Amino acid sequence: MKIWTSEHVFDHPWETVTTAAMQKYPNPMNPSVVGVDVLDRHIDASGKLHSHRLLSTEWGLPSIVKSIIGAARTKTYVQEHSVVDPVAKTMELKSTNISFTNMVSVDERLIYKPHPQDSEKTVLTQEAIITVKGVSLGSYLEGLMASTISSNANKGREAMEWVIHKLNAEIEELTASARGSIRTPMAAAAFVEK
């Protein structure tokens, strides 16, 4: 078993970061995620948003893994459960693979919280527990997978920034459009009065 952990601070408020987290896929930084399906989404009695999603991924595999499972590329599935608490301002996301569970399990947990000293920033804490089963090189493969998870976490943070930029651009466009539609009737009224 290998445990990987990381912490990152986003220079954006919690509301922005959690909105981006829910819209993270697809993105150009991680093209291996080829599909996201929402299986269930509801708000509980306390106002928390619960989501259960299925992520479809397609990976190119290292040569040692290819020889073990006999494939060069493989489609895998990950189930993801998230809970967003708008009152406590926390988002917890747990994911686990549901493909190849007889060979490997990857359990990941992400927590988004406002930065304790700066409400305009958000702290992301990540943890992944990797277990390779029934292979003599299990420890080596777990280390290799931890390295891949670390690289993908960096890509994930880049993707979050990309989504946030995209969301901000959409907001600016809507704001400009709304201002234009407000000015048009006002300009017409001013023209009629002359």
From Swiss-Prot:
Keyword Phosphoprotein among UniProt keywords: yes
Source organism, top-level taxon: Eukaryota
Keyword field: Phosphoprotein
All residue ranges annotated as the PRELI/MSF1 domain in the record: 1-172
Matching PROSITE patterns: PRELI_MSF1
Residue numbers bearing the Phosphoserine modification: 46, 51
UniProt GO molecular function: phosphatidic acid transfer activity
InterPro entries on file: PRELI/MSF1_dom (IPR006797), Slowmo/Ups (IPR037365)
Family: Belongs to the slowmo family.
Protein name stated in the entry: PRELI domain containing protein 3B
Protein source organism: Sus scrofa (Pig)
